[in-house]
């Protein structure tokens, strides 16, 4: 089994696959009579013309490290954002595409409270909270059409921290 090492999650490192969603620095603007800071437009949400943005709640079972990555998926009709409700860190495995096959895998681990938006058509692992079960608000495409493609890996990867 090949090994895949977890690398630091930064906006720059994750940019080819999506967006890091985090409260970094001061807010972009103050709202509600100055009592609330708004960190504005943190993700490149992208849905086809027949879909719309929807919010779902996911309740995911805990995983541990090292983690066996044996299945990835992608969503050709829309992006998918994961926002932790419990502050549980989660593993984010992503890959480039080569003619419908995931290649050049990378792995990241969120810090408590960080979320990610995964771009449309980007191969990624399933939701994997590390160390404890996690609940997540997920913003993704709701609508007609096949928006899920799964790819079982012929040779699983062992993700290590």
Swiss-Prot record:
Pathway: Nitrogen metabolism; (S)-allantoin degradation
Family designation: Belongs to the ureidoglycolate lyase family.
Key words of the record: Lyase, Purine metabolism
Protein name according to UniProt: Ureidoglycolate lyase
Keyword Lyase: yes
Gene3D superfamilies: Ureidoglycolate hydrolase (2.60.120.480)
Molecular function terms, GO-annotated: ureidoglycolate hydrolase activity; ureidoglycolate lyase activity
Broad enzyme group: lyase
Gene that this polypeptide is encoded by: allA
Source species taxonomy: Bacteria, Pseudomonadati, Pseudomonadota, Alphaproteobacteria, Rhodobacterales
GO biological process: allantoin catabolic process; purine nucleobase catabolic process
Domain of life: Bacteria
